Amino acid sequence: MPKIGIIGGSGVYGIFEPKETVKVHTPYGRPSAPVEIGEIEGVEVAFIPRHGKYHEFPPHEVPYRANIWALHELGVERVIAVNAVGSLKEEYKPGDIVIIDQFIDFTKKREYTFYNGPRVAHISMADPFCPELRRIFIETAKELNLPVHEKGTYICIEGPRFSTRAESRMFRQFADVIGMTLVPEVNLARELGMCYVNISTVTDYDVWAEKPVDAQEVLRVMKENEEKVQKLLKRAIPKIPEERKCGCADVLKTMFV
């Protein structure tokens, strides 16, 4: 079974021809969609469309626990998450790729943990993303001459609404990009000892910029971002070593009370 899982949206559709589709039943309900299993450049991978096959789940209703649990149950050890984000900084331009290294959680009512009792866990999130996967994707993006930022702080809001201008200006003080789907996905992967890397693609500037958003321009950028992400995945995934040496699973040794 695959040891690499991808969670993403339309930008990842069609990257491989599924060899198998697996319906996984979890203690947390059904995942967003059946898990598709196929190969990318000879490497077996599993894929879950985060928002569902027909984009039926808004960000605050995505079954995050079921998605992560399903991948873990299939034997996945590494999760590659792809998100579209808005930019909070001038230098993070539409069309850029950001390999996120930190996040701020501004969500409000999601299921954040697998441990709601009777067992209690406190997971360290000081460095929430896998250093080994981050290095591979940064190096590969540079090899491909893609516009990549090696670091970025992602602020995750509840959604599905977008920010007010006042909120956007406040968020600019703390973060570089803004989105709605990183949390609790990253927390949950860490609780199961899985490696997790986030590839964020910038579609536009958030409303702080006070520039009119051109819908056609956003669609054009999104299409270009899809091509960049697929190119990046196809080049980077074969470089991921079979054995994990990152220490991501070590957090399990100290998380339980």
From Swiss-Prot:
Reaction catalyzed: S-methyl-5'-thioadenosine + phosphate = 5-(methylsulfanyl)-alpha-D-ribose 1-phosphate + adenine
Pfam family, one: PNP_UDP_1
Cited InterPro entries: MTAP, Nucleoside_phosphorylase_d, Nucleoside_phosphorylase_sf, Purine_phosphorylase-2_CS
Stored PROSITE patterns: PNP_MTAP_2
Influence of pH: Optimum pH is 7.4. Active from pH 5 to 10.
EC category: transferase
Function: Catalyzes the reversible phosphorylation of S-methyl-5'-thioadenosine (MTA) to adenine and 5-methylthioribose-1-phosphate. Involved in the breakdown of MTA, a major by-product of polyamine biosynthesis. Responsible for the first step in the methionine salvage pathway after MTA has been generated from S-adenosylmethionine. Has broad substrate specificity with 6-aminopurine nucleosides as preferred substrates.
Protein's recorded name: S-methyl-5'-thioadenosine phosphorylase
